[in-house]
Amino acid sequence: MALRTIDALDLAGKRVFIRVDFNVPLDPQGKVTDDARIRAALPTIRHAIQAKAKVILASHLGRPKGKPDDRTKLTLEPAAVRLSELLSQDVILADDCVGDGVKKLVRDLKDGHVLLLENLRFHPEEEKNDEAFARELASLADVWVNDAFGTAHRAHASTAGMAKFVKEKAAGFLVQKEVEYLGKALGSPARPFVAIVGGAKVSDKIKVLENLIAKADAVCVGGAMAYTFLKAQGVPVGRSLVEEDKLELARQILERAEARKVDLLLPVDHVCGAEPKETAERVVVNDRAIPDGLMGLDIGPKTLDRYRQRIAGAKTVFWNGPMGLFEQKPWSEGTFGVAKAMAASPAVTVVGGGDSAAAVEQAGLVDKMKHVSTGGGASLEFIEGRELPGVKACEE
């Protein structure tokens, strides 16, 4: 099934409901501290404005729990202010996302003007994909557009449920870009295709690893999950984090990679500390084995060099998961080293959301990558080969 996109629709004079992802971080004063998600939605919003649509935007923010101060702490007002600055035009903020007041605002909305509905999750029915709530949202729209890739793996009322009750539906440009880049990286990559996989737990990445082993030419493993693989090979790992109940699974993954003739690379040296703290002494262990009393907290310099060489020789590079405890400076070189190597590569470089995207952002290298996914859980599920409800709803 092909993805129908917003540019295939006539939007003039229509009520165009765009599900965006404005789940942005706020400081204690309620100011947006990182507007990347708002900026990511701009091409779709601008297209609808220029097409003279009545633009209705909807998003969630945080996880409201029905507390009295949720309405002030988790309001979308800061997002409305920032969006207004980015668009250089007024953005009307509704005080709810359903109800008579909202219907009146939609009725009075002029072509080319923008209305942002209040936080969808102030209504528990949103996450329950409640049919009556989905119908109520749908009553505001002639056209439904999903541009929130970050929530595309959730079957919520606004991300999937309401699509059944709106005649015209499409993906926004952000969802289209995500599906194209992630789909191409995994479906028909230019080869050699090198995958870099990190993170703390093998259990979080089982399906991702299995899918990548079926498609990649080489998989470079870092992060704490590497110690489970090393222990599965009989290598001492000191006090490193190990999932004891996943050792057999790690062996099976190693065997599968060997059977498929995929190079599965594990660290050959480590940056260690006595504990995972910024103040711990940084010890470079020039060996696969980690001594007792130390724990691996980052890949070592030799390992980083090996991974750099693989990246340099690749035509497609996909990265998901940090190489170490990169939030703390002593253990950040592996992660930022991978980011820099990818930035310097002419290959198609795709970063699969979550912590890797945060690291690329922190390193100021977003513009040097072909694509940095905005979806953490959504990009993981896409890589696992699962169907995303928010994407399926946009198919013709």
From Swiss-Prot:
Residues annotated for substrate binding in this entry: D21, F22, N23, R37, H60, L61, G62, R63, R121, R154
InterPro entries listed in its UniProt record: Phosphoglycerate_kinase (IPR001576), Phosphoglycerate_kinase_CS (IPR015911), Phosphoglycerate_kinase_N (IPR015824), Phosphoglycerate_kinase_sf (IPR036043)
Binding annotation for ATP: K205, G296, E327, G353, G354, D355, S356
Keywords noted in UniProt: ATP-binding, Cytoplasm, Glycolysis, Kinase, Nucleotide-binding, Transferase
Alphabetized Gene3D superfamilies for the sequence: Phosphoglycerate kinase, N-terminal domain
Entry annotated with the keyword Kinase: yes
SUPFAM superfamilies: Phosphoglycerate kinase
Pathway(s): Carbohydrate degradation; glycolysis; pyruvate from D-glyceraldehyde 3-phosphate: step 2/5
Pfam families: PGK
Location(s) in or outside the cell: Cytoplasm
EC code: 2.7.2.3
Listed GO CC annotations: cytosol
Catalytic activity: (2R)-3-phosphoglycerate + ATP = (2R)-3-phospho-glyceroyl phosphate + ADP
A GO MF label: ADP binding
Class of enzymatic activity (EC top level): transferase
Superkingdom of origin: Bacteria
GO biological process: gluconeogenesis; glycolytic process
HAMAP family, per the entry: Phosphoglyc_kinase
Subunit text: Monomer.
Family note: Belongs to the phosphoglycerate kinase family.
PANTHER family in the cross-refs: PHOSPHOGLYCERATE KINASE, PHOSPHOGLYCERATE KINASE 1, CHLOROPLASTIC-RELATED
Protein name in the entry: Phosphoglycerate kinase
Encoding gene (name): pgk
